[in-house]
Amino acid sequence: MKKKIVHPIVLAILDGWGHTNIQQGNAIKIAKTPTIDSLIQAYPSTLLAASGQEVGLPKGQMGNSEVGHTTIGGGRVIQQELVKIGNSIVDNSFFNNLELNEACEYANNNKASLHLIGLCSNGGVHSHIDHLLALIDLADSKQVTNLYLHLITDGRDTSSNSAKYFIKIVADHIEHKQFATISTISGRYYAMDRDFRWSRTQAAYNILTSNNSIKLNASVNYGDLIDHYYNKGISDEFIPPSRINLGSIKDNDAIVFFNFRPDRMRQIVQAFVQKPFNCFATKPLYNLRVVTFTNYDTSLNTTIAFHPHILNNFLGEVLYKYGLKQFRVSETEKYAHVTYFFNGGAEEPFPGEDRELVSSPDVTTYDLSPDMSAELVTQKSISAIKKAIYSCIVINYANADMLGHTGKLKETIQSIETVDRCITELLDAVSKLNGTLIITADHGNAECMFTDEGNPCTAHTTNLVPLILIEGEQEAISGHGGQVKLRNNGSLADIAPTILDILHLKKPPEMTGKSLIINSRYETRNIEKTSIEL
């Protein structure tokens, strides 16, 4: 029996690849990208909203990888945790949150301490400083006796030297609250590692659980501490874990981890709650009450303050229900995004969903290896394409985002040129199977490498992102015998419906996004799409 050849749809997500016509500091425009440039000229393309309300964030809030992949995979706008928690503060339901109130009461009943741990900035990607301030107010209202703040400095989703600004907001907020103390400071490089570089996590853990201080010539207050590292060329992200006041975590204490995004909190939380924990030596701590803002991982024994939405019929689930095979591939930095987030928070793959994890380079920062593992990701993708069994292949290229975060223009340009070469190889493999290649991005970053003042810009942007549709036979999905046309004013929520449109599959009612194809053969010829009970 002759094997059936599947003509795949390959979705290549170029992480951090935004669009702007501004040339200065635009690594994407400066880079030589002959393949992508030629594809934009030769094939249908459009620009998509990837930030703000179009992806379930507050108006004007930059997009990010978690939100981007969730929106792409979901085919709908989902209210994000940043908005959900922010709204709860506005309507005061935050202060009635059972789990947060119980954490305060636990500390009081045990004559112990409450510890708040999280990223201290207004970046809105992993956390928000407003949530921290609300937690402090809640602790005040519950008459917590000892409140210790363990602040993680940002420098990626905010400017690289903004830590003092944000910590001052916190310091001013607790100035007349004698029960509250800023205890430790740590750069996110250490406290928020997600790549199993356990020595970084260990450094953060040790400072949280020990009252030993890093000795400095200057007096230890947050301003002096940060200036000490600035003078050594160390920016916010890389500030070593440092203690500035007493307040280590002890038996019977309560801890609230207030990041709402899970991926960069899992390792540090594991060190406190996972038994046995074998990644590094930990301090015996008993009777801790650990609360996380959101569900960081189903395997972690924590109390969850804000329970997740129940999300059904994401693209992966729909493909599974139609009996189609799919493949996901990325390197370590973005693996969770093409799997967990793309599937709406489902940890396990659906039947028929294969996954491939490619290790990211073992370097301190990615400007030391701008190519990252893009070539190996490409080879794994091509191998999957050649099998001719997958109807949908989802790939993430991490380069533009991870290099954009370094603020290094030259290295970011190199990384973008690497991705362009990889797209050349990918396109050749897709074309040989008469498949469809969709190139898009989850948010902007590398197109804006400098601030208006000329300083390095390491944060994401609110810019639109491109989408290019390369179909071997455009007439196959066009309703008028010519090239496919794509509409404007779309968003990331429209990508999954577009994929289902090309596959001639009916989208589920949960997918409120709409196909980007204007002249789909199914609409112009009134052809009924394949449908099953979803």
Curated annotation (Swiss-Prot):
> Active-site positions, per UniProt?
S65
Q: Which GO terms describe its molecular function?
A: manganese ion binding; phosphoglycerate mutase activity
Give the keywords, sorted. Chloroplast, Glycolysis, Isomerase, Manganese, Metal-binding, Plastid
Broad EC category:
isomerase
Q: Where in the cell is it found?
A: Plastid, Chloroplast
Task: Name the EC number(s).
Answer: 5.4.2.12
Primary location recorded for the protein, binned into one broad class: plastid
Q: What does this protein do?
A: Catalyzes the interconversion of 2-phosphoglycerate and 3-phosphoglycerate.
The signal peptide here is none
Q: Would I find 4Fe-4S among this entry's keywords?
A: no
For whether the record's keyword set contains Chloroplast, the answer is yes
Annotated Mn(2+) 1 binding sites? D401, H405, H460
Q: Give the required cofactors.
A: Mn(2+)
Positions of transmembrane segments: none
Name the UniProt record assigns to this protein: 2,3-bisphosphoglycerate-independent phosphoglycerate mutase
Q: In which pathway does it act?
A: Carbohydrate degradation; glycolysis; pyruvate from D-glyceraldehyde 3-phosphate: step 3/5
- What top-level branch of life does the organism fall under? Eukaryota
Cofactor binding notes? Binds 2 manganese ions per subunit.
